[in-house]
Amino acid sequence: MAPRSLYLLAVLLFSANLFAGVGFAAAAEGPEDKGLTKGGKGKGGKGTKVSDDDTNGTDPDPEPEPEPEPEPEPEPEPEPEPEPEPEPEPEPEPEPEPEPEPEPEPGAATLKSVALPFAIAAVGLVAAF
């Protein structure tokens, strides 16, 4: 049976690598502004930036409602048209080529950079037990 210090060391390694992996994932999102966004229905759609001129869904200058128009006179029934000839079926369009995957930005976290600390921690845990 391994000494208690090896168990503690393995847990500490795992925790450190876990936090490092979370840091890599956060760095991958980029330094863009994480300002407030509003969701749901309303101006701008879901997930748009909240602006200072937001009027909370009320229209500051409501337009007056138009007056109802008089009903038009009924028109005589048109004569039935002859049946048109069936159109030929269109040919199937060729499938577009898939777009190549864009290369990751420099310094962005990749699967390899995030998974490597977890793999090291897992090996450490297995070795400790």
Curated annotation (Swiss-Prot):
Sequence repeats lie at residues 59-60, 61-62, 63-64, 65-66, 67-68, 69-70, 71-72, 73-74, 75-76, 77-78, 79-80, 81-82, 83-84, 85-86, 87-88, 89-90, 91-92, 93-94, 95-96, 97-98, 99-100, 101-102, 103-104, 105-106. Coiled coil: none annotated. Glycans are attached at N56. Keywords: Cell membrane, Glycoprotein, GPI-anchor, Lipoprotein, Membrane, Repeat, Signal. A lipid is attached at G107 (GPI-anchor amidated glycine). It is a lipid-anchor; GPI-anchor. Residues 59-106 are annotated as: 24 X 2 AA tandem repeats of [DE]-P. Residues 53-104 have a biased composition (Acidic residues). Residues 108-129 form a propeptide. Residues 27-111 are annotated as: Disordered. It is found in: Cell membrane. GO terms for cellular component: plasma membrane; side of membrane. Its main location: membrane. Residues 1-27 form the signal peptide. Major surface antigen of procyclic forms. This is Procyclic form-specific polypeptide A-beta. It comes from Trypanosoma brucei brucei.
